Amino acid sequence: MRQTLPCIYFWGGLLPFGMLCASSTTKCTVSHEVADCSHLKLTQVPDDLPTNITVLNLTHNQLRRLPAANFTRYSQLTSLDVGFNTISKLEPELCQKLPMLKVLNLQHNELSQLSDKTFAFCTNLTELHLMSNSIQKIKNNPFVKQKNLITLDLSHNGLSSTKLGTQVQLENLQELLLSNNKIQALKSEELDIFANSSLKKLELSSNQIKEFSPGCFHAIGRLFGLFLNNVQLGPSLTEKLCLELANTSIRNLSLSNSQLSTTSNTTFLGLKWTNLTMLDLSYNNLNVVGNDSFAWLPQLEYFFLEYNNIQHLFSHSLHGLFNVRYLNLKRSFTKQSISLASLPKIDDFSFQWLKCLEHLNMEDNDIPGIKSNMFTGLINLKYLSLSNSFTSLRTLTNETFVSLAHSPLHILNLTKNKISKIESDAFSWLGHLEVLDLGLNEIGQELTGQEWRGLENIFEIYLSYNKYLQLTRNSFALVPSLQRLMLRRVALKNVDSSPSPFQPLRNLTILDLSNNNIANINDDMLEGLEKLEILDLQHNNLARLWKHANPGGPIYFLKGLSHLHILNLESNGFDEIPVEVFKDLFELKIIDLGLNNLNTLPASVFNNQVSLKSLNLQKNLITSVEKKVFGPAFRNLTELDMRFNPFDCTCESIAWFVNWINETHTNIPELSSHYLCNTPPHYHGFPVRLFDTSSCKDSAPFELFFMINTSILLIFIFIVLLIHFEGWRISFYWNVSVHRVLGFKEIDRQTEQFEYAAYIIHAYKDKDWVWEHFSSMEKEDQSLKFCLEERDFEAGVFELEAIVNSIKRSRKIIFVITHHLLKDPLCKRFKVHHAVQQAIEQNLDSIILVFLEEIPDYKLNHALCLRRGMFKSHCILNWPVQKERIGAFRHKLQVALGSKNSVH
């Protein structure tokens, strides 16, 4: 029933007038058949939503009931979420009104009892969420009709047992969530209702389970996943659990934080008769892993042992884990005191049994060092993380990784280990290594290049955040395959040596030299790095290099980087930019010049940045944003950052910029608050985007008079030159036109037989293309014959006469339009004009335009007095860029050649 609030209004104190103010549902948002009515303090179900909605969200409201009648209009619902309300009872008729309902979420309500009728009509449900209610006991069989149910969530209730019914049911159930209840024992008679079920996940975490009765798991048809996290099992109950799991279908077993402090060769004995593939023993404070503890788990593939306290890993502790591919030992070996004697130990050959191991995580441990046979036997290891793992790994020698000599290691993480020195041949055993991370250490040395010997397949070396690195010409000579080199904040020295330390890195795509206070760079430092795509040089001191006052002039250290996509030059103190500094950077997409001292930029500095998408110039000293400087850069921009610049709000400085930002779709963060005028004084602090540009229109009489006089003078000069150089041609065309109009010559093209299918008008420079493609079309279609000047003009005939005759003998005229054609004097002055004139005089639609290049209409009109709108669409063709579309182009051309010449 709709709840209403009576609102009584009095007028004059005499005439009462009552009104009913209904609760509003207009705040619900509806999109793509999904209605969101959450967080609206609703006390009843809205009745004005579209009838075709399939998803309805009513969470976080004040609903106490769900009257079935209120859902009559929403019969298409497949998902209903009424969580976080105060519903205490569910009407059985609800699902009768919602026959298509598949997902019902009732979490965080006040349901306490479920009768046999509660879900009797919810036969299509696949998910039922009842977590965080007050259900303490399941009586009879409330879920017996849910034959399609896949997920049932009863977690965070007060259930004291797993009994959910008295007869076999829920045959399609895959996930049963019973965590955070008061279950103390698992009994077969309570679980036998799942005799026909295949449970992929049985979630019993955070219960007080003390007993596993015999056959409790065998009562379930098939059990694949069991989760008992945060259950105080201990070693004894864990052993009993595993015995009960024997001969089941268990695949995944999670025992995180189950107080399993020790393991022995009998702990997991029961799992010998299973095919367990995943075992989670994390957060157990496990300190003793006995020999052969996991010998019964030959099928295990994923093993989680992180956050334990293993004091000694024996040579046979991991025996039997022959198929493990992933092993997580993060923070599993931690010392108990500051005493060196308390450091955890890992025996040699401890990992030799893990023949299939590919991923090993040993981060955040207190291991004394790497022994000569620590990793021996890991013949399939590809990823090894040793970040913050060692207490005394100060120097990497040629013996450090000898135990990995037979491992096909691809990724090695050695960060946060306080490494101070890398000796020659330190990685010579790691020939397959692709990624080497040495960041966040204390390395301080000269890199001779011998450190990387043997890294024949290296792809990335990360050396950022170390003490200092001094480069030499051979620092990277032995790693030509390197594509990513990170040298951020390493107090880089000798970077300006010649030849450049980076010269051998021809395959480099990412180079990070930021935060190094670099002041000197040679113009050949990046020479040869033609594949470089990302260059980070922020937070250095490169200002002098681009000054015109620099001895020898500006240093163009970016030359040749034709494939560079991202350039970061933030915080370098630049106050000048040479006009050609970005000349070669045609593919540049992101430029960051923020936090510098730039004021005036050269007019054409961004002319070649046609691909630019993001430009950052924040916190500079820019006062003027003019079109001649920023126009090319802003053309395809998607993001612009020019915050905190002292803009000069005058017509000359920002009028164009204001018009642009008010019209563009480019993302400009904080436009209203951080783009403020600095000068003149009366505009100080005024938002730039609100600057009135209407006053910038020039209406000075003198300038207007000057423009008019200049225009008249230029027109007069043009006419004089035209008559002087082209007078005879004008006279000739005038006479021809007069003769045509007066009827000196009659032409009836309807009965005339043409010798050529088309006459080709093209620029001289395009003759090779014309010959290649039109002659090949003639060979493919014998009925086609084009008039090609080089082949078909009669010898000895005057060229102009031959052109006129050939056009008359051709049924169509094809213009091959390129920039060369627009500049070809013969084509512009005679061929094109004569062809168009003949088509107009004969009332024919005989011209076909073939565009080999993208030519704007205004250029076409300016050069040839033609526009695309003068021709039918099928007579305008564009040469395709893709070779596979050439056949389609030729087909369209043949259609155009076969079309009627008549305009009507």
From Swiss-Prot:
What span is annotated as the signal peptide, if there is one?
1-23
Listed as disulfide-bonded, the cysteine pairs are: C28-C37, C95-C122, C649-C677, C651-C696
Q: Which tissues is it found in, per the record?
A: Expressed at high level in placenta and pancreas. Also detected in CD11c+ immature dendritic cells. Only expressed in dendritic cells and not in other leukocytes, including monocyte precursors. TLR3 is the TLR that is expressed most strongly in the brain, especially in astrocytes, glia, and neurons.
Q: How is it modified after translation?
A: Heavily N-glycosylated, except on that part of the surface of the ectodomain that is involved in ligand binding. TLR3 signaling requires a proteolytic cleavage mediated by cathepsins CTSB and CTSH, the cleavage occurs between amino acids 252 and 346. The cleaved form of TLR3 is the predominant form found in endosomes.
Transmembrane feature ranges? 705-725
A single GO CC term for this protein reads: endoplasmic reticulum membrane
Q: Where is this cross-link: Glycyl lysine isopeptide (Lys-Gly) (interchain with G-Cter in ubiquitin)?
A: K765, K812, K831
The impact of changing Y858F is: Loss of interaction with WDFY1
LRR repeat positions: 52-73, 76-97, 100-121, 124-145, 148-168, 172-193, 198-219, 222-244, 249-270, 275-296, 299-320, 323-344, 356-377, 380-400, 408-429, 432-454, 465-486, 507-528, 531-552, 563-584, 587-608, 611-632
Q: Where is the LRRNT domain?
A: 24-51
Record bears the keyword Cell inner membrane: no
Q: What is the effect of changing N196G?
A: Reduced expression levels
List keywords of the entry alphabetically: Disease variant, Disulfide bond, Endoplasmic reticulum, Endosome, Glycoprotein, Immunity, Inflammatory response, Innate immunity, Isopeptide bond, Leucine-rich repeat, Membrane, Phosphoprotein, Receptor, Repeat, RNA-binding, Signal, Transmembrane, Transmembrane helix, Ubl conjugation
Q: Which PROSITE patterns match?
A: LRR, TIR
Q: Which GO terms describe its molecular function?
A: double-stranded RNA binding; identical protein binding; pattern recognition receptor activity; signaling receptor activity; transmembrane signaling receptor activity; ubiquitin-like protein ligase binding
Subcellular localization is given as: Endoplasmic reticulum membrane; Endosome membrane; Early endosome
GO BP term (any one) = JNK cascade
Q: Which residues lie on this side of the membrane: Cytoplasmic?
A: 726-904
Present the record's domain note.
ds-RNA binding is mediated by LRR 1 to 3, and LRR 17 to 18.
Quaternary structure and partners: Monomer and homodimer; dimerization is triggered by ligand-binding, the signaling unit is composed of one ds-RNA of around 40 bp and two TLR3 molecules, and lateral clustering of signaling units along the length of the ds-RNA ligand is required for TLR3 signal transduction. Interacts (via transmembrane domain) with UNC93B1; the interaction is required for transport from the ER to the endosomes. Interacts with SRC; upon binding of double-stranded RNA. Interacts with TICAM1 (via the TIR domain) in response to poly(I:C) and this interaction is enhanced in the presence of WDFY1.
Q: What does the protein in this record do?
A: Key component of innate and adaptive immunity. TLRs (Toll-like receptors) control host immune response against pathogens through recognition of molecular patterns specific to microorganisms. TLR3 is a nucleotide-sensing TLR which is activated by double-stranded RNA, a sign of viral infection. Acts via the adapter TRIF/TICAM1, leading to NF-kappa-B activation, IRF3 nuclear translocation, cytokine secretion and the inflammatory response.
- Disease connection: Immunodeficiency 83, susceptibility to viral infections: An immunologic disorder characterized by increased susceptibility to severe viral infections, including herpes simplex virus (HSV), varicella zoster virus (VZV), influenza A virus (IAV), hantavirus, and possibly respiratory syncytial virus (RSV). IMD83 clinical manifestations include acute infection-induced encephalitis and pneumonitis.
Family the entry assigns: Belongs to the Toll-like receptor family.
Q: What is this protein called?
A: Toll-like receptor 3
| Native source species | Homo sapiens
